[in-house]
Amino acid sequence: MAKRLERDGQPNRSLRIPAERWRFRIRGLVQGVGYRAGCCRRAQELGLAGWVRNCSDGSVEVQAEGDEQRLTELRVWCEGGPPGARVDSVDGSRVATTGADWFEIRPNHFQGGALTR
């Protein structure tokens, strides 16, 4: 991450908020209800980078990168989901940042390497 320097040569930490990357696994009735599209839309509104995809076990996986406040707002959205979804749980963890600068819907991820849309 680029750092801006003050006149004394020290970094000005107030100019850049360090990014974090969070991973969520959402379980419940979350496939076939517009969950990925809604999540992508909300993440883009929040200015987050990352992706969302369906998993073979019926869950949805999200990885999002940005500041902690906006990531928390996305998690709150994930806990409710779009109309028609029934969220039973949202498990989250921090993962390494990637420096991505967009949010996308990724192809479905199924164990064994098979990918579908």
Swiss-Prot record:
Its EC number is 3.6.1.7. InterPro entries: Acylphosphatase (IPR020456), Acylphosphatase-like_dom (IPR001792), Acylphosphatase-like_dom_sf (IPR036046), Acylphosphatase_CS (IPR017968). PROSITE patterns: ACYLPHOSPHATASE_2 (PS00151), ACYLPHOSPHATASE_3 (PS51160). GO terms for molecular function: acylphosphatase activity. Keywords: Hydrolase. Pfam families: Acylphosphatase. It catalyses: an acyl phosphate + H2O = a carboxylate + phosphate + H(+). Residues 21-107 form the Acylphosphatase-like domain. Gene3D superfamilies: 3.30.70.100. It comes from the Bacteria. The active site is at residues 36, 54. The keyword Transferase does not apply. Belongs to the acylphosphatase family. This is Acylphosphatase. The lineage of its organism: Bacteria, Bacillati, Cyanobacteriota, Cyanophyceae, Synechococcales.
